[in-house]
Design a protein with these regions (language model features):
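Positively charged, low-complexity terminal tracts
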Residues: 1-113
Length: 113
């Protein structure tokens, strides 16, 4: 399999542990009307960096990140949808409310080779 070219890198670490630089090979970033910035980046370790950045004025955490394997990312999304369905929330309606009705989403994809 052909090795993908890095388009950037991210520094990962936790607490007092060692920091390490990981190459990003693919990504998509969406900016929503409320200036929330959501990024899904695929890394050279075959894992995903999921990031949500909020404006300071939102009162929410300014940045939240998760670094997950493909299996863990799939399990997270599946469990979220399962939770919604269990509580009587239609996932498609929820996505429509927050995503499809937002006419001002700006998308940025990494370039394809």
């Amino acid at each position: 399999m052909e090795e993908k070219k890095n388009i950037g890198e991210v520094t990962l670490g936790y607490g007092d542990g060692p920091l390490r630089k990981i190459g990003i090979t693919d990504m998509v970033r969406c900016e929503f009307a409320d200036h929330r910035l959501v990024t899904v980046a695929y890394t050279e370790e075959d894992a995903y960096l999921l990031s949500v950045e909020n404006p300071q004025s939102s009162g929410r955490a300014t940045q939240t990140n998760m670094y997950l394997t493909e299996g863990s990312a799939a399990a997270l999304f599946y469990t979220y949808i399962l939770y919604l369905e269990h509580n009587g929330t239609d996932a498609n309606e929820l996505f429509k409310k927050y995503i499809l009705d937002d006419k001002e989403i700006k998308y940025e994809f990494s370039p394809k080779d």
